[in-house]
Structures are given as C-alpha cells and as structure tokens.
Amino acid sequence: MDIRFKQVDFTYQPNTPFEQRALFDINLTIQDGSYTAIVGHTGSGKSTLLQHLNALVKPTKGQVTIGERVITPETDNKNLKPIRKKVGIVFQFPEAQLFEETVERDIAFGPKNFGVSDEEAKKLAKKMLDLVGLDEKYLQHSPFELSGGQMRRVAIAGVLAMEPEVLVLDEPTAGLDPKGRKEMMEMFSRLHKEHNMTIVLVTHLMDDVANYADHVIVLEKGQIVRAGAPQEVFQETQWLKEKQLGVPTAAEFAEKLVAKGFSFEQLPLTADQLADQLLKKMQEAGEAK
C-alpha cells in the first residue's frame, strides 16, 4: 500500500490569531514495502507529517492518498477507522500509553476494539509478543512490573496486533541505552525484511538512517529540502553539518582519513561499508608491492 502526498499544506488553528503553518507544498510517495526515514530539527514538521499518514489530521490544502483512500480538507471524519488499522503509529515513549491489568489485555485491546473475538485477540497477543522478542510467560504479568525496554516492546506489540501494513515510528529508541536501541532497531528491520512491512522512521540518529533506511526525507521549516537514498543524501556532509543534522559515525571517520590523504570510491556511511572499503584498499596495496 503506497501513501502519496500531493501539494499538501497544513496549518494549525487557521483563520485565528494563533494560525501557524506547519507544512508547505509537500509532495512525496512512501512506496509499499519501503523503509523511509524522516529527519529534521525540532519544529521542522516531522510530527505533523507523521499524523497525516493515518489521517489523525487532514491536510489544510492538497490531498493525501492512503492506499485507495483519498483524504482532502473536505473529507468527513467518519469512517476513517479502517485507515488507523492499516497504518499503525508508535509515538515517542509508547509505554506511557499502557493501561491494562495484564500484558495480554493491553495487546488485545486494539484488535477487540475493531471487532476481533476475545479468543482471536488472545492469539494475536501471544503472536505479537513473540514477534517483539518477549516470552509468552509475560502475558499474565502487569505491564508495569516490566523493565522500561520490555514495556516499550509490549506497547509496540499492541500496535502490531492491529496487523498494520505500514508501521510509523516516532523516535522509537528515545531513552534506551545503546544495547536496547540496537535490539529495537534490529527488530524493526526484521519486520521490514521478513514480513514485508512498510516502515516510516522519524529519528534524529543518522546512524540508524544509514544502517536501515532505503529512502530519507529531510524536512526544514515545513518543507522537503532533500530526498533520496541515504547513500546519495549523506554524501553531502558539509550541507548536513550546516543544517546541524549530524553525519553518520562511519562517514565522519572516513572524512578524517580523507583529510590525511586517504581516498574512497564513495564515502562509506556504515561500519560495514567502511570496513569493506578499507579491506579493499589494503588488498590493492598488497598486490601493488
């Protein structure tokens, strides 16, 4: 299922003294099965764009097409519920939204709200808990007895229990330690690769974009200022620094080598790419002797 934006503007509190325009002429396509990262400073419009992905808000101008459903400023708010099932959003610190007495009941809440039987909802809860890497023994535990990382996995399982086609992640690793962040990002990568799930990642961590995304969109003041494959967008390291977006760690290290006379065919963005290019250079140097 593709999601397409066509000439989308969005304004908060239009026609009031508090009017604030958040998005300007957004044109983009999030392709079915893709892994798209959205980056930009606080206030760049990332969260507003994110809320258009499952019609939590409607465009002030233009249209958003979600699968076969076209959302315009005139779209009735009724019957938008099916979209929320197709596009699941995991907001920052989703564990704050846990509320049920047991993990099972929390995960099953969404499906039951969409008419799934109690028995089927319990099956989904067990399946999704396994999918996020937690043992079924936790099903009857209170979610509030779990660690912070486990609580976040339970909250994500609750979104996955809706069986969405698109999973939208708003800073999903915020507050996690490096090990927890790595495990979480690998989990999303498995969902993408093994279940062909479309992933949209909002993040400020350029290493995660370089390691996992196949497309990146850069927002600034409500406008798209760059879009393309990470390997293309992140080659412009000076531009990234000027925009204070940060540079992937491997690219930053590679630039230091370049400053000392080393050359790369293409600036590596990940540790694997850096290692591969260094090994190739060493082999070439060995053959030249």
From Swiss-Prot:
Q: How does it sit in the membrane?
A: Peripheral membrane protein
Q: What is the lineage of its organism?
A: Bacteria, Bacillati, Bacillota, Bacilli, Lactobacillales
One GO term in the molecular function aspect is: ATPase-coupled transmembrane transporter activity
- Tell me where it resides: Cell membrane
Under what name is this protein listed?
A: Energy-coupling factor transporter ATP-binding protein EcfA2
Is the keyword DNA repair assigned to this protein? no
What is the name of the gene encoding this protein?
Answer: ecfA2
Instruction: Return the InterPro entries for the record.
Output: AAA+_ATPase (IPR003593), ABC_transporter-like_ATP-bd (IPR003439), ABC_transporter-like_CS (IPR017871), ABC_transpr_CbiO/EcfA_su (IPR015856), ECF_ABC_transporter_ATP-bd (IPR050095), EcfA2 (IPR030946), P-loop_NTPase (IPR027417)
Q: Quote the function comment for this protein.
A: ATP-binding (A) component of a common energy-coupling factor (ECF) ABC-transporter complex. Unlike classic ABC transporters this ECF transporter provides the energy necessary to transport a number of different substrates.
Question: Cell membrane: is it a keyword of this entry?
Answer: yes
**Which residues form each disulfide bond in the chain?**
none
Task: Enumerate the spans annotated as ABC transporter domain.
Answer: 3-246
Spans traversing the lipid bilayer: none
